[in-house]
Amino acid sequence: MNTRDKIINHALKVSCDIYKANKVFVLSNKNRQSETIKAKRMFIYYLYTYMEINHNGMKKYFKSINHASSIHHVNKFKFEVETYKDVSSSFNKFLTEMKKFSMYGGGFYEKRVEIKRLLDELKQITND
């Protein structure tokens, strides 16, 4: 299992822990309980927004999910985070846990932000 997969597995665990959902139910489309859907939405949103997995790429992690379902879950979760304080609070708790989970000795997110900053700097230099 590579580092990226370890981070993704940890994200699944954290989202399931927050909503007390079953991992198997989250990854399959056989359970429509509220906790399962909330954990699934958070996990899909995280994969799309933070791990940069496109909607078609979600098929690797979920049984029988299509891109339209992925788009719906991302948009719905984004709306809920912006609208409901409890969802926003849960997501902040999730992000805090994910930032603690470090595979590189330092924070994964901090290094990713630094890489993006450096890439932008390189683009600016080459365009000048």
Model-flagged regions — what are they?
Residues N56, K60-H73:
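Short, basic interhelical loop/turn and adjoining N-cap
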Residues V81-Y109:
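Short Lys/Arg-enriched helix C-cap and helix-to-coil transition segments
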Residues N2-V14:
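N-terminal leader segment of winged-helix/HTH proteins
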Residues G107-D128:
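Short, low-complexity, charged amphipathic interaction modules
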Residues I37-I53:
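Short, amphipathic alpha-helical "recognition" segments used to contact nucleic acids or chromatin
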Residues V14-K40, I65:
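Short, Lys/Arg-enriched anionic-surface-contact patches
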Residues Y48, H73-V74, K78-V81:
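DNA major-groove recognition helix of helix-turn-helix
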Residues L12, N54-N56:
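Helix-turn-helix DNA-binding elements, focusing on the entry/boundary residues of the two helices
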